[in-house]
């Protein structure tokens, strides 16, 4: 699982994380998404 460290949102899939960053945090450039993964941490599988 992934948790957004900016807003605390919990996500089950990496795709959901990408959608959350694009929609929830208004990131427009997919090429920079990897940088924003620092806002997420994996929580137990």
Curated annotation (Swiss-Prot):
A zinc finger (C2H2-type) spans 2-25. This is Uncharacterized protein A-45. It comes from Sulfolobus spindle-shape virus 1 (SSV1). The keyword Zinc applies. Keywords: Metal-binding, Zinc, Zinc-finger. The keyword Zinc-finger applies. One of its GO terms (molecular function) is zinc ion binding.
């Amino acid at each position: 699982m992934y948790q957004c460290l900016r807003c605390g949102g919990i996500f089950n899939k990496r795709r959901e994380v990408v959608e959350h960053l694009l929609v929830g945090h208004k990131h427009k450039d997919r090429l920079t998404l990897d940088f924003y993964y620092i806002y997420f941490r994996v929580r137990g599988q």
